[in-house]
Structure formats: C-alpha cells, structure tokens
Amino acid sequence: IEGDYGAKTLKEIMSVLWAARAGLREEEILGYSGLKPMQWAYIRNALGPTLIDASGRLIFAHDYMRIAVSDRYMAGNNTIGNEGQSQEALKLRCNAHSKLAKWFESYAFKDGQSIVSDERAAEEIPYQWQQAKEWKKLQTTLTKQKMLIAILKHRSEQELLSYWLKLEENIKTDIETQYEKAWKKWKLDQTEEATGDLAQKLADFLSFTGRWHQAFTKKIADLALENSIHVHGNKSEITNRS
C-alpha cells in the first residue's frame, strides 16, 4: 500500500487512527490528512478489513493492527501499552497525540463549520493532551469556557475530574484556583442568563470535587442564585433548589 499511495501518506493516516480515542469519522480523516475523497477511497479500499466502521467511525479491526502501526511508525516493541517501550517510542507516541490535539483545536468551537463538533472536541482534545503528557496545555484546555461547557454537556463531571486528578499527579495546580482565574479572564456579563447557568454548572462541579466549602465555589453559587432571581424571579428551579 505504501508503494501505491506513498509511505508518508499512509504513515499519517495510520498514526492518527492509532492516536484517536475511539476512531475517527471519514470527514475527520480527510480534514486531518488533506486527502481528496477519491484518494482516500482508494486507500480505504486497499486497507480492506483492517479497518471497520463502528458507529460512524473507523477503527482498527484488531489489536494486532494497533501493534503493527506502533511497531512500524512509532518504534514500538510489539505491545500495545506504554510499559517497556523505549524513550524513542514514547516520544513518538506523545507526538502523535499532540499533533491530533492541535488539529482538533484548530477546528473546534467555530460557528458555521461542521468538521469538529463541540461533542467531538470535548471527547478528543483533553484526552489527546493527557496522552501526550502536555500537562500545561491540558490545564489550559480545561479552563477554556467553551470547553468546560462542552465537557459538562457531552461528557461527565467524572471525566472532567479525572483530568484534574491526573494534572495534580504531574504538576502543581488547584482546581478551584484555576477556575477562579479563568472566571475572571472570561469577563462574563453577570446579568445574562447564560452566565448564571454556567456559574451553577461550575459550582456543581466544584462541589462534586469536594470543594463546596471553598470561597470561590460559594461565590459563583451565590451568583447563580442572584442571576436566576434577576432573570426568572423567585420561582425559578435554582431559587427553589437553593
């Protein structure tokens, strides 16, 4: 296949499929690789049963394909995991994840385009930075307003917390402090309903992490309540809950 379609092209496609969290849509493969649909159709046909469609995404049919891709393009040692891999292999794996994270970021949260949905951005970008061990970039991603909203809508509080716990294992950081800094940076209009909704979601998440007694958590919980009263009056759901 490399001889027919180019070793560089095949390496790029197989490496990005290896790095993806749970496969890629064909539109994402085309966007990432820059291939034209007809070019990709020939390559896809040549790859045959090594790839399968899983809920609209292409994934490797068997683990042996993941191993083969790792061995050929990332100096792998004939195993799936990172344990026992050489420093060269680990670096190449991190590079593959980092490159995919950057691609998703370049298309994420842009109105009027459909290559990367908010749901896919929330699924892939934090995961890719974590796998790349780019801790500062992961932290920056998690404290972006649109990413926070997307994760809480399309993923879960548990998943968001898991990223922060991984961060705390590797760098000096604090969830509440980082979101307090981010909140100030966002410069939101506190009278808008969307601001109140976000404040409540963030307060709920911080409470979920065990920080319900912290000053910033209380502050945004109070803001959410005041915003709800301002927008809806005393009979709103948040008001009654509080």
Regions from the PLM with identified roles:
Residues 3, 90-97, 114-115, 122, ...:
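Inter-repeat boundary and helix-capping residues of tandem alpha-helical solenoids
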Residues 11-20, 26, 116-137:
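P-loop NTPase catalytic cores that bind/hydrolyze ATP
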Residues 63-99:
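Short, amphipathic alpha-helical interaction segments positioned at domain boundaries
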Residues 8-12, 41, 45, 63, ...:
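Non-catalytic, well-ordered alpha-helical scaffold segments
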Residues 2-71, 98, 102:
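C-terminal boundary/linker of central alpha/beta nucleotide-binding cores
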